Each structure stands twice: as structure tokens, then as C-alpha cells.
């Protein structure tokens, strides 16, 4: 937060993603009033709570291909390899060589304030994935900003709607809701900072387009959390990170369902 009237770090809106873990937070900042700078006590600029004291907050552990791969392995009869998106964009890896592609986005999104470029689908990746789908591929995508990060331009929206077969309906920022229903299960994801896995402060509500259909909904309510499409190619897209599903058993069951959807005749 950096305006003429307010300053600070709003952990309730976005707690950030620590490198591996973070022990430096004592609590969420509660006072952002610039006129209270230089003062002490409750209400002063920068005053915060104490709810995070003693907590080793989980961050980016850089092992998400392993987490996804473990779920793939549990499904049986499948092998997997992993690579960076840059390897695909630079032509070092060809998606058409693989019957199924799992595109892991996590909390990646474009941020004008960041020096690093973390666009969910770069222009190059859009072209590559379009070719892969048109060749009859099976594409699994998961991430918290698959809709919101692609809603700004008509070209980006056309890619998600015409190729991946989903539209963006808004972001769910109510952190009291951490349950998602689908594939016969009720799963949970962490919405607040914790010691187990990175927090997902906002998730995307994505709706099916064309002949796609909803496969997950946020609970309570019925906002769509994931879609699947079956045509000349197949897509399965989640508006939340797959690796944020807290139960390993749930991840294995859901991955088996996704792979089954891709391979069934």
C-alpha cells in the first residue's frame, strides 16, 4: 500500500510468498495512516497484530513438479518428466512429444511492480499451447490467477475462451472459504499464512465456454472453480493451484480422475 494517505504492507490482501519460509512476521499490519507516522502504540503507522509470532510461515519450496509427479505416480501406469516454461518457449522441449501436459502456475501472474515477468500465459506460450491443442493434445492447467491475469486484453481472453475453453467470472477473496467440491470429494486449500504450504489469498472463478462443463465449485455457494473440455482435444483447468490441495490422498484421487478424463475414449 503506497498512496498519499496510506503506507504499509497489507498481509490480508496479499501475504506474499516467502523464499522457502519466513519467520520475520509478528502479525498483519492494522494501521496504514501516514498522519500517524512517528507515533507509538495502537493506531500508529505500521502497528500490527501478534497472531503470526512464533510461526514459520511456509513459502515457495520449489518442489511442485515432485508434488504433481507423486500424484501422477499414485495413479499408476504413467511416467512423467518436468521442465521450465522457458524451455518450452525456447524450443528445447516440444509439447507435441507428450500425450498429456501439466502446466503448473501456482501464484504466478503479471505484476507491473515486479522486475521479473511471471505472466500466466506469455504470447509465445499461447502460440505453443494453441498448436498443441489443435494437434489433439491433453492440457491440464492450474493456478490462482488463470482468469484474472488473462482478462485485461481481448487477445488474452480469446485464448482462454476459444482454446482453453473457460471464461473469467471474478476472484474469490473471502478467506473464510477454503473448501472446494468436485469429483465426488470436498477438498481444502490454505487461504491464510500457515506452516504447511504457501497461502492462496485469492482464487479465480472460471466458467465453462462452448461445450466445456464445470467440474469443481467453491463452497459454500456454487461459483465454478474448475472446468473440463472434451472435443478434438481436451483441457482441464483449475482456478486454484493443484499443489495447494492439502490432502495428499485428495491430490492423488483428483489427478487420477484428470488423467482418466484425458485417456478415456
Model segments located where?
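Alpha-helical scaffolding within the catalytic cores
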Residues: 85-92, 123-128, 220-225
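A glycine-rich, often tryptophan-bearing local segment used as a flexible ligand/cofactor-contacting loop or short
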Residues: 108-213, 220, 254
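The substrate-binding groove and active-site-proximal loops of carbohydrate-active enzymes
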Residues: 53-59, 103-120, 241
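Aromatic-Pro/Gly-enriched surface loop or interdomain linker
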Residues: 1-100, 233, 244, 256-265
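Extracellular/periplasmic catalytic domains that process cell-envelope and extracellular macromolecules
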Residues: 73, 93-97, 132-135, 207-209, ...
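Short loop/turn segments at strand-loop or loop-helix junctions that form parts
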Residues: 1-5, 98-110, 143-144, 238-240
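A glycine-centered loop/beta-turn motif at secondary-structure junctions
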Residues: 1, 6-21, 137-139, 193-265
Amino acid at each position: 500500500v503506497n498512496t498519499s494517505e496510506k503506507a504499509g504492507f497489507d498481509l490480508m490482501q496479499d501475504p506474499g510468498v516467502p523464499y522457502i519460509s519466513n519467520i520475520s512476521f509478528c502479525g498483519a499490519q492494522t494501521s496504514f495512516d501516514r498522519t500517524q507516522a512517528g507515533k507509538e502504540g495502537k493506531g500508529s503507522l505500521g502497528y500490527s497484530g501478534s497472531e503470526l509470532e512464533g510461526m514459520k510461515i511456509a513459502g515457495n519450496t520449489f518442489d511442485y513438479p515432485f508434488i504433481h509427479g507423486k500424484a501422477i505416480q499414485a495413479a499408476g501406469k504413467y511416467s512423467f518428466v518436468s521442465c521450465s516454461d522457458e524451455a518450452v518457449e525456447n524450443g528445447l522441449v516440444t509439447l507435441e512429444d507428450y500425450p498429456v501436459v501439466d502446466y503448473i502456475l501456482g501464484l504466478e501472474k503479471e505484476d507491473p511492480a515486479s522486475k521479473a515477468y511471471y505472466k500466466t500465459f506469455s504470447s509465445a506460450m499461447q502460440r505453443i499451447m494453441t498448436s498443441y491443442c489443435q494437434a489433439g493434445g491433453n492440457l491440464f492447467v492450474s493456478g490462482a490467477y488463470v482468469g484474472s491475469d488473462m482478462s485485461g486484453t481481448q487477445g488474452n481472453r480469446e485464448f482462454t475462451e476459444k482454446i482453453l475453453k473457460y471464461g473469467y467470472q471474478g476472484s474469490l477473496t473471502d478467506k473464510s472459504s477454503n473448501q472446494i467440491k468436485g469429483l465426488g470429494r470436498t477438498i481444502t486449500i490454505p487461504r491464510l499464512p500457515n506452516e504447511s504450504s504457501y497461502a492462496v489469498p485469492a482464487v479465480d472463478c472460471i466458467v465453462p465456454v462452448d461445450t466445456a462443463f464445470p467440474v469443481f465449485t467453491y463452497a459454500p455457494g456454487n461459483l465454478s472453480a474448475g472446468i473440463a473440455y472434451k472435443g478434438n482435444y481436451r483441457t482441464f483447468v483449475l482456478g486454484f493451484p493443484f499443489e495447494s490441495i492439502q490432502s495428499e490422498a485428495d491430490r492423488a484421487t483428483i489427478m487420477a480422475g484428470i488423467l482418466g478424463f484425458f485417456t478415456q475414449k
